[in-house]
Amino acid sequence: MHVHVCVCLCVCIYTSSCVCACVHMCMRDALLAEGRGGGLAAADDFLYLECCKCFSQESQIAMVCQERSQNETYEVKMNNDTEACRATLNLEERRSVAIRSRENVVFVQTDKPTYKPGQKDVNGIAQFFLDTYTFTYPNITLKDPQNNRIFQRQNVTSFRNITQLSFQLISEPMFGDYWIVVKRNSRETVTHQFAVKRYVLPKFEVTVNAPQTVTISDDEFQVDVCAYNFGQPVQGETQIRVCREYFSSSNCEKNENEICEQFIAQVQTNLDIFTLLCSSFLTVMQISEKTSVFITQLLGTVNFENMDTFYRRGISYFGQLKFSDPNNVPMVNKLLQLELNDEFIGNYTTDENGEAQFSIDTSDIFDPEFNLKVRHQRTEECYLPSWLTPQYLDAHFLVSRFYSRTNSFLKIVPEPKQLECNQQKVVTVHYSLNSEAYEDDSNVKFFYLNGNFSFPISISADLAPAAVLFVYTLHPSGEIVADSVRFQVDKCFKHKVNIKFSNEQGLPGSNASLCLQAAPVLFCALRAVDRNVLLLKSEQQLSAESVSSLYNMVPSIEPYGYFYHGLNLDDGKEDPCIPQRDMFYNGLYYTPVSNYGDGDIYNIVRVRSLRILENIIQTVRTNFPETWMWDLVSVSSSGSANLSFLIPDTITQWEASGFCVNGDVGFGISSTTTLEVSQPFFIEIASPFSVVQNEQFDLIVNVFSYRNTCVEVSYIWECLPGKVNITVVAESKQSSACPNEGMEQQKLNWKDTVVQSFLVEFLFLGDILGLALQNLVVLQMPYGSGEQNAALLASDTYVLDYLKSTEQLTEEVQSKAFFLSILGYQRQLSFKNSDGSYSVFWQQSQKGSIWLSALTFKTLERMKKYVFIDENVQKQTLIWLSSQQKTSGCFKNDGQLFNHALRNALFCLEAALDSGVTNGYNHAILAYAFALAGKEKQVESLLQTLDQSAPKLSKRYYWERERKPKTEEFPSFIPWAPSAQTEKSCYVLLAVISRKIPDLTYASKIVQWLAQRMNSHGGFSSNQVINVGLILIAARGEEGLFSKDQNTVTFSSEGSSEIFQVNGHNRLLVQRSEVTQAPGEYTVDVEGHGCTFIQIFRYTGIRNKSSMVVIDVKMLSGFTPTMSSIEEVNNRSLIFQHKDSYIEYKRADSFPFSVEQSNLVFNIQPAPAMVYDYYEKGRQATAMP
């Protein structure tokens, strides 16, 4: 019987979308069973496979696994049918297989990489895999540089795979890197980083081109400096300085005049002395741009490239040599000498790429390993011992033996270059198969056991970004002979997306057309950003490369064990059936040994992860804004969209790109397209920001023209004595007809304009919170400290609580308060210390304030029902507060509080009461605290004491502070009340209305006095007073203190009158009436239930020192402060910010900073510097230089 045996070669290309499984035996059943105690698969899933059949995961064996959603371990059990295969053996074997569940790919993209304070961060989150249109993210958070969560959205559902969110930054944020963290269902996270800092976009770009390295054999090197304004050359003066940095070698010259030199074309000749005597760095500088040049004695480097770490005996060993200079420039036509185990084997000459190919016949090599060495063949030259001699770097490479029991091998010729998509790649395979297994059978015919063959592969998007080719055969002795190679493929996608502007250039303010081509009926995201923004900070732009990097095609293989997601798939080492003992053969003893450096087929299989099956198809698929486009657009059924956008006025280069996601064809991304916006002819006026009367300055007008033709410029000047109005006009020679009426005239009435130096308004409203609601930011003064910001946050929260309890909270008001609360939360976190406490000012060495930390904790807890608050931040603060508590229950009196009248409130209340309290402010706080605790006896006693000390003025009750300023005996206006006095009265009112049975009559008399102290914004003189005042209003707004009845208010003067209706429907409406004549008499009549308060207040203090003052310095005309000196002032422990600087009282001090003249101004007038007490603004002083 003659049996024809062929060599069966199975070729499998392993990508992220396909896995091949080959069964090399006739069998009856191939059962897939769950390896964790589960039963076998159903009979319908049995496979009937013939010899050497390959199938992919899309076949039946994969269909069994598609119902599994989590990572599982399975066993593949196979046995043969002796009758079908005419065999005499029954074989059964099991192998463990891990099946990876489907995982989506998620990426985050912001509209730009860097933001200024106060800007809005706009980001898009996208994910894709083929058969889904929506996806839900469990959690999306934004973290500041201190790792605080300042924004969070939960269970966010995307629409057609794209989610778009935005977040508003405050005007004074923490500078540094912010992180967007997206949590997926698999509990893995995706992060994206952006920066927040102060910056100014450059008007033009300067580049310095210089070699990275200069060798000691170079007599000169070239430096190119280029300045461009988006393709247009910039005219100006250029200075190039080449400076050799300091080097400690004693051989270097010490002549300081030769350290820095100015060069135009080439380096001066004395540079030869420097390079020969010492190796150092050169720094080439041009304005703010610089580059470094390294001086080296290394003239060239030889490298091995595209080398295999193993050789296979009988198959030639191929490799490549590369020779380049220190700047990685190929060295052409150079002689290289190759050695094997220190024996010369040949000379090779480099080609135009500096490369040379070599091959080694391995038929007679039996060594476990051999060493290759290549060096440059150079002539011998003489040098003095003190000289730096030219050197060339040699290369070494160690090649190990590949083990085969039958001495049979396969070798796939690798491809070092990246393969282009939509092309054919011809793969060549060399093979050498040992014929000894067939020699005992004379009926066997052998064909081509040594040689090579080739076959083509179509490089499609399915193979991107990398594919593994695995080729193997079964030797008759039972050994698997195989090899594999990884091909790098261009980052291409099945989904082709293309965007292009209709014109490459455009004018500011004109329309630009953008053509988008993609798969039909889908959504695409577009982005166009100013190129200058990208120059500020390098970011990983969303591109085909960045998307491809998100894929983990092959899981990592541990050096000890075959682990995948915690599952060990290694079969383990089994004891051999026959022990390894010395063998006696032909009169000699042979000892079995092994070389652990040999490669083998098992390592190839492990690295290619052929035990892992994946049922996932991972196909990779206004007006000077810094971001022009950030939109989601729909593509029609034709697969295209023509869009029109108004070009911003910025003269710059816009970079636009887009990506699309489609459920049928997957993900696609376009290449970047640019639009250059320039003005061929324009003017620019260089003038100071502002000038004062009687000052003079030179008005400089720059005319820019990038036209190829001459442009007529007219200069008209009529010399007249006195003041002259200057008008600069840029116009074209195109004429057009004007309307009959000529230019339309419009009268502008500014809100804050003082008409004829007189402005008086009467305000009418039915709810005391009307003004506070209209001005949720209720202070006119700066509020940069943590103490003031916390009180302001609390105020907004109490306003919302009051409106909610009185059923007046609208969506518009809630949205506004939500926005302000997020900004306030960001600001408050900037005062948080690393231990969880809060300080009044942000300084790294600041000590936490117990009072401020407690207030912040309480405020943020109340804010939880309206905005997101990081629970970890609250826990950290609570732990710190607990550490400050004494065993008696009292707290340490640590930290600082900047309102002197509030400091005594930090003592333990009950201990203070028992020890005898005489301070009226403490009486008020104790009364409120005991009222909240329900201790009526203590409250009654304290209120009686307070009632005796209250001045009862016209049935209006209030409480003065102990050291009050003197007031006029017969004041014309209601006296202005200091912060401590107002706050003390607020606490008494809180105590009254917080009792079990509040005395509303008594409380209304306090409310009338407090209402007279409210400012035009609905607040009081400081944040602390606003906080306490709004607490009582919000807490007991429903108790009937503020009327809901109908009121009619008549405001009249000579010859005119106005009537206002105030009722429950418009109780929050602020109604105004402007006084247009003065002097005059006006009458206000109120009918019904309600009150109207008109107030003007002033104050003159008597204190010798202030708690916290604000310094407001006005700049001289034509001058601006230097940022470096401002930063030095900010770093001092007394300063928080530079525009309105808050100063803690410690001692008399000065705060110098530098200014520079940006515009030339003559007869400069002095600029005032104003200092005022934050809490009592009446204490102020102004100085003139």
UniProtKB/Swiss-Prot annotation:
List of glycosylated residues: 80, 155, 347, 452, 725
Keywords: Bait region, Glycoprotein, Protease inhibitor, Secreted, Serine protease inhibitor, Signal
Location(s), subcellular: Secreted
Highest taxon, organism lineage: Eukaryota
Function as written in the Swiss-Prot or TrEMBL entry: Is able to inhibit all four classes of proteinases by a unique 'trapping' mechanism.
PANTHER family in the cross-refs: MACROGLOBULIN / COMPLEMENT, OVOSTATIN HOMOLOG 1
Protein name according to UniProt: Ovostatin homolog 1
The organism of origin for this protein: Homo sapiens (Human)
